[in-house]
Structure formats: C-alpha cells, structure tokens
Amino acid sequence: MPVSRRQAAAALAALPLTLAAAGAAQAAAPVPAPASARGPGRPRREGTVFIAGDSTAAPKTAAAAPEAGWGMALPVFLGHGWTVANHAVNGRSSKSFHDEGRLAPILEAIRPGDLLLVQFGHNDEKTGDPARGTDPYTTYQDYLRRYLDGARARGARPVLITPVERRRFDADGRARPTHGEYPEAMRALAAAEDVPLVDVQAASLAEWDRLGPGGTLEIFLHLAPGEHPNHPEGKQDNTHFRPHGAVEVARMVARGLKERRLPHPGALRRLDDAVPEGVVTWPAG
C-alpha cells in the first residue's frame, strides 16, 4: 500500500532531529498593494495573501506605535490586484491560534489561488504554557498540518515561513539562533508535505549577523527615553520591530516568495528598492 504524505510526515516527526491585538477583525481586512507598486497593464488575476502568525507579523494600532509587524509592510512589495489579509495576532502559537478559532475565518474567506502564509514559533516555544506550547516534532507539526490541509482543501496555496530571529549576540558580536528545533521541524514538515517554505529564520540570522549589535538597533524596537510619546521612558525590545525592521523582514518574505514563483512570476515588486518607513501606518483604536 503506498505511503501517504501524512504517514510520511508522521514517520519523519518520530526522528530525533534537532500577544490579543485590539481590533483584530478590522486589522485582518485585506490591504491592497499601494499604487506605487502597481505595474502597467492588466493583472493576471486578483488574489489575497492571508497571514496566520504571531506578534512579529501582526498589525498594530496607533497605541502600539512605533512597533510594527512585517505583515503591515508586505503590501508594498505586491503588485496590482493583490491584497494582504493579515490575521496574525500578538502572543499566539500554532496551537492557540487554531484552538481560539482564528484559522476558521481564514478558511471561510480563502479562495483558489490565494496564498496562506503560516509563521509560528516564538510562542510555541513556551512549553510551560499548556495553551500555547508545542513540541517541535509532534504537536507543532500536527497543528501546522491543519493550516496546510485547510488551505489545500480550498484550492489555496499554503506557504510555511520559519520564525524570524530575535536580536541576540554572543560575546564576539555574532548573531545567535534562538528558536531551538522549531525551524528545523518546520523545514522537515515542508519537505514531507511538499509545500513551499520561506526560510526567514536563516535569512534574518544572516542579516542580523551582517548588521551586528549596533546595526540591528535600527531593526528592533529600541527607543531612547522621550523618543516616542507611547514610550516616554524608552524601550528595549529584542523581539519586535520598528517600521524599518518590519519593512526589511517583509522584504525577506517577498524575496522568498519570488524565488518560489509565488503567487506568480511578476507579482512581487520593489524587492531591491529603498522603502521609506512611512509605508507603515497604524489605525486608531
């Protein structure tokens, strides 16, 4: 009897390898690509890029500025006819996002040819929290399959995205990985399920290493006292992004999609352009 993808994934999983945002429903409304990203001529088709993820991708309101998720910047890299429906929510894992019923509205809205970008890991690592924690090669992969299966059953195309790295350096100033076995477990699942994977973990680790401890301060949410009214005492956050950081991580995602010819050749724009921070905006609420 032929071995199914699910059986193959289960066998692979057995190998010993290595925060809620207010106004989430409003934030998940599709955001069209900006006019500056529109190319000439008639688009091949219109579609939506859905995002399921955590705070590193999630939309923020004005009260959280200048913090920004990479999903807020993704529309600038999409061509005419493509929109972003950012359902990512602060503090969620692959498990809690699903168990809270947040995957269901995505699957109700998604259409054939749309993309579902799935990026979890930061909160799956919190294994002391039964509502969020998962094991890399068992429950993490099991929950991720629910996103893959749901999208594929509706003719949409799921894409796994490894979790973006935090800002952590060793004594020699080299960027260090922080996600344990979760990125490798996602890579293994993508191979077993034959779905595209954008390796943002590897791309971001290399970029943070290139920028170094000083350069990454412009990526992450490090603010001096008095720099922003929402954080009068300043802030030092090595997980979440300033607008520039959100743009650069969105660029990593967009480049990975283009390499995989998703959603189709020519759908991605401005991948090598200087993009101003002003493309990121925060709705009131």
Model-found features: residue ranges?
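Alpha-helical cap/lid subdomain in secreted, periplasmic
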Residues: 102-247, 251-266, 283
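N-terminal secretory signal peptides and thylakoid transit peptides that target proteins
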Residues: 1-15
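Short, low-complexity, Pro/Ser/Thr/Gly-rich segments in the mature regions of secreted, periplasmic
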Residues: 277-284
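Structural motif
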Residues: 93-101
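C-terminal region of N-terminal signal peptides and the immediate post-cleavage residues
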Residues: 19-38
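Glycine/Thr-rich phosphate-binding loops of Rossmann-like dinucleotide-binding domains
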Residues: 59, 94-95, 126, 169
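Short, flexible loop/turn segments with low-complexity composition
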Residues: 262-276
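Serine-esterase "nucleophile elbow" of acetyl-processing enzymes
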Residues: 34-88, 104-112, 116
